């Protein structure tokens, strides 16, 4: 996969291009090792400096980075024996939601998540990660299956929002989301949710009601996109950077408000720089969360989840 850079990363991109050019030019007659090491050190220092002070708008753009790992990437790196399950048994199979049975270090679990595409064809097939009602009904079907077989549920959240098309509304988009919220609140098995990219409004919440809610360092969680907020408040999407700052959509701000449990640190430069490392960190977090939740009885699990939901909105 070709590495892509955002505009605030362009100085880093220039250094990386120079490093690649030197590597290509290096041969037995010309040893450029020292110069390459010097530039690599300079690139690392510049990357640390750049990412030490990202604002909310820059974090929003990182959450949408085209190279960022998606749900299926995490499934590949974290789980074994993944068996995808399809369809809502009522209308269709929504490719914007993926899910199925898998093993986490040998333990059977149910994994569900939003899935975006990378190529134009994949993006269209996955509807840009925006599920229709049948996607949320598929997710609910898998959750109910997990409860019947007493399997923990692990969800990965990464969507700009639920699909707002006419067909989706006619098929009951709002009802599908609302039903998921109600049913997830009553599940008697552990539910762990992780925001890996964009956490867009009800489209994210529909698989986001859990006993543990974690976020990656450069992910976002909000009721609307910065562009949408800016269009409503200032009648211009160009105010998106201002909107991002006041919306409090970053992981650090949401942790301050006690809306999430933990923040997963990403590799230097973002999760897309090192899939294996971020997957390793996330796997450890999932195992720790499961171990904690396993100690609770069904009643304690439900009571804690209820108290968690009722605490939202209180300072």
From Swiss-Prot:
InterPro entries: Acetyl_CoA_COase_a_su, ClpP/crotonase-like_dom_sf, COA_CT_C. GO terms for molecular function: acetyl-CoA carboxylase activity; ATP binding; carboxyl- or carbamoyltransferase activity. SUPFAM superfamilies: ClpP/crotonase (SSF52096). GO terms for biological process: fatty acid biosynthetic process; malonyl-CoA biosynthetic process. Its main location: cytoplasm. Its EC number is 2.1.3.15. Keywords: ATP-binding, Cytoplasm, Fatty acid biosynthesis, Fatty acid metabolism, Lipid biosynthesis, Lipid metabolism, Nucleotide-binding, Transferase. The keyword Plastid does not apply. It is an enzyme of class 2 (transferase). It comes from the Bacteria. Disulfide bonds: none annotated. GO terms for cellular component: acetyl-CoA carboxylase complex. Residues 38-292 form the CoA carboxyltransferase C-terminal domain. It catalyses: N(6)-carboxybiotinyl-L-lysyl-[protein] + acetyl-CoA = N(6)-biotinyl-L-lysyl-[protein] + malonyl-CoA. Pathway: Lipid metabolism; malonyl-CoA biosynthesis; malonyl-CoA from acetyl-CoA: step 1/1. NCBIfam families: accA (TIGR00513), AccA_sub (NF041504), PRK05724.1 (NF004344). Component of the acetyl coenzyme A carboxylase (ACC) complex. First, biotin carboxylase catalyzes the carboxylation of biotin on its carrier protein (BCCP) and then the CO(2) group is transferred by the carboxyltransferase to acetyl-CoA to form malonyl-CoA. Belongs to the AccA family. PANTHER family: ACETYL-COENZYME A CARBOXYLASE CARBOXYL TRANSFERASE SUBUNIT ALPHA (PTHR42853), ACETYL-COENZYME A CARBOXYLASE CARBOXYL TRANSFERASE SUBUNIT ALPHA, CHLOROPLASTIC (PTHR42853:SF3). Acetyl-CoA carboxylase is a heterohexamer composed of biotin carboxyl carrier protein (AccB), biotin carboxylase (AccC) and two subunits each of ACCase subunit alpha (AccA) and ACCase subunit beta (AccD). This is Acetyl-coenzyme A carboxylase carboxyl transferase subunit alpha. It comes from Haemophilus influenzae (strain 86-028NP).
């Amino acid at each position: 996969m070709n590495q892509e850079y955002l505009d605030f990363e362009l100085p880093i991109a220039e250094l990386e291009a120079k490093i690649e050019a030197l590597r290509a030019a290096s041969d037995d007659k010309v040893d450029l090792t020292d110069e390459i090491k010097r530039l690599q050190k300079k690139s690392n220092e510049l990357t640390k400096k750049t990412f030490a002070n990202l604002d909310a708008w820059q974090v929003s753009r990182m959450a949408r980075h085209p190279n960022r790992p998606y749900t299926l990437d995490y499934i590949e790196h974290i789980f074994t024996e993944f068996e995808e399950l399809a369809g809502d048994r009522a209308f269709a199979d929504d490719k914007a939601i993926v899910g199925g049975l898998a093993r986490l270090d040998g333990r059977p679990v149910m994994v569900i998540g939003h899935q975006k595409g990378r190529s134009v064809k994949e993006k269209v097939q996955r509807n840009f990660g925006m599920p229709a009602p049948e996607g949320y009904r598929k997710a609910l079907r898998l959750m109910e299956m997990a409860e019947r077989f007493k399997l923990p549920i692990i969800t990965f959240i990464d969507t700009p929002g639920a699909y707002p098309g006419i067909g989706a509304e006619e098929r009951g988009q709002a009802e599908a989301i609302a039903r998921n919220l109600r049913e997830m609140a009553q599940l008697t098995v552990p539910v762990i949710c992780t925001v890996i990219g964009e956490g867009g409004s009800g489209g994210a919440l529909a698989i986001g009601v859990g006993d543990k809610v974690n976020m990656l360092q450069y992910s976002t969680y909000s009721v609307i996109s910065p562009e949408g907020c800016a269009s409503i408040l200032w009648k211009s999407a160009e105010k998106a950077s201002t909107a991002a700052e006041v919306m409090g959509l970053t992981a650090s701000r949401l942790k301050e408000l006690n809306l999430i449990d933990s923040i997963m640190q990403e590799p230097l430069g973002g999760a897309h720089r090192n899939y294996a490392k971020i997957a390793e960190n996330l796997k450890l977090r999932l195992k720790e969360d499961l171990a904690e939740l396993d100690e609770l009885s069904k009643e304690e699990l439900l009571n804690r989840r209820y108290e968690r939901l009722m605490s939202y909105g209180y300072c």
